Regions:
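Acyl-donor (CoA/ACP) binding surface of acyl/acetyltransferases
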Residues: 1-35, 68-192
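Short gly/ser-rich anion-binding loops that grip negatively charged ligand groups
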Residues: 42, 46, 65, 72
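Conserved GNAT-fold acetyl-CoA-binding loop/helix
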Residues: 34-57
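Short loop/turn motifs at secondary-structure junctions and domain boundaries
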Residues: 59-64
Length: 192
């Protein structure tokens, strides 16, 4: 991934790679968050500055693995979209929006923009989401961004309540996916 990547979301919003220097923005963005961290092994609720730096170091796009794009309005971080490589030809996408910014369509626009960029810019044919079955807003984001339900996996998603996976709790996840249109076989549908 190019660290200088910027994707325009319209209405003054843009996506760009989050880097170590964005730790303060991440702390500010999560200051009112009571839910678990954005994703991965970070503490519940707000990030401290050391937690934010550790998370951003893990999401370094130069490392070639997982990375995160921030949704920004000027210099205010409104949310983030993470892309985590999976098996060859696929990647998981995760997203988070500040509570005060939810319900404005920001997540749908950001997910759609990163999905299209991942298909075209990174040549990843399949992008998938893991969604808690009770997370209705996230399910609406998936639908609005053009994702399709694939399956329900029992006890597949980790809660990250503890650092040790053996002692953590796990919950069911709904898998939604988006396949790059040029890789889908055309289906002839009779005219009705």
């Amino acid at each position: 991934m190019r660290p200088d990547l910027t994707l325009d979301l319209g209405n003054g919003l843009h996506l760009r790679a989050l880097v170590l220097d964005d730790a303060v923005l991440l702390v500010q963005a999560t200051s009112g968050e009571a839910a678990p961290s954005l994703w991965g092994p970070r503490p519940a609720g707000p990030y401290s500055l050391p937690d934010a730096r550790a998370a951003l170091a893990e999401w370094d796009p130069a490392a070639g693995g997982q990375f995160s794009l921030g949704v920004l309005d000027g210099q205010q971080l409104l949310g983030a979209v993470g892309l985590m490589p999976g098996q060859p030809g696929s990647a998981e996408l995760a997203y988070w929006i500040r509570p005060a910014q939810r319900g404005r369509g920001i997540a749908s626009r950001a997910v759609q923009a990163v999905t299209i960029w991942a298909h075209r810019g990174l040549a990843i044919p399949r992008i998938w989401l893991e969604i808690d079955p009770g997370n209705e807003p996230s399910l609406r984001v998936a639908q609005r961004a053009g994702y399709h339900f694939e399956q329900r996996l029992p006890r597949h998603c980790r809660d990250w309540a503890t650092e040790d996976a053996r002692h953590d709790s796990w919950h069911d996840c709904l898998i939604w996916s988006h396949v790059e249109p040029s890789t889908i076989e055309p289906v002839l549908v009779p005219w009705r």
